[in-house]
Amino acid sequence: MKPENKLPVLDLISAEMKTVVNTLQSDLPSWPATGTIAEQRQYYTLERRFWNAGAPEMATRAYMVPTKYGQVETRLFCPQPDSPATLFYLHGGGFILGNLDTHDRIMRLLASYSQCTVIGIDYPLSPEARFPQAIEEIVAACCYFHQQAEDYQINMSRIGFAGDSAGAMLTLASALWLRDKQIDCGKIAGVLLWYGLYGLRDSVTRRLLGGVWDGLTQQDLQMYEEAYLSNDADRESPYYCLFNNDLTREVPPCFIAGAEFDPLLDDSRLLYQTLAAHQQPCEFKLYPGTLHAFLHYSRMMKTADEALRDGAQFFTAQL
């Protein structure tokens, strides 16, 4: 679609979303648009420091977990000694960016609002690691904590997965992987999905929305996909195009959150409609006036805080 035909998104977003967009960090260098992925990762980490400040304090522990690919870093957030469940969090970043620091505040708030242990998994990024390595390492970490739950003093009898953007895809893909391969890591009580992509290659929102403000132009989305997948055939894998998986049975209860001006919104709508049509437990909530990635901005946006509280409430209601 010609750029001129797209919606004037920055004129339509909410006042609090505009405040975020217009917030300048004077000590931040320019985005390295033509830089290496390493430079973009470094910038992303620096840019997120401001948005992660002021998060709740709680007991936090870091562990390296063995997988067949090597060790993966994990971080445990423990809001109380007797947690009713454990939530595994998978960060967004287009499969190529992000780490446990860039999503620290999100994980802390989720732990605080749910009063559950949250475990962030620093899964391997692309293009160094190609599909399905990230999913396999996530599953390995989940299995490790299930086997060692007593040693780590965590409750793995009931678990959940949560993630934003690319992390939302990894969240649902990991839950389906466990189901399909009959791997027991505890009962999956719920899955929390904020503005994910689930397999659509084109849609109305992908045509009308997306630009330099969110890093989700058609070219951006293609770049993320090419970095993540090993080959063209992977596009149809049921763990990448999740609509090619069986969504008619034994899908854990899903909280599906959409951002109004997100080009990936139709992925969330289709996922909800598919699950609902087959009587799979799910809830969809649209957050008006928001852009993709708004969950990061709870320092300024009540809507971001609300979205985290909604996800936490959904999860605890399943326990």
Swiss-Prot record:
Where in the cell is the protein located?
A: Cytoplasm
The record places the active site at 165, 262, 292
Question: Per the record's keyword annotation, is Metal-binding included, yes or no?
Answer: no
GO CC terms, sorted: cytoplasm
Chief location bin: cytoplasm
Q: Which family does it belong to?
A: Belongs to the 'GDXG' lipolytic enzyme family.
HAMAP family named among the record's database cross-references? Acetyl_esterase
- The entry's protein name is Acetyl esterase
Say which species the protein is native to. Escherichia coli O139:H28 (strain E24377A / ETEC)
Q: What gene is it encoded by?
A: aes
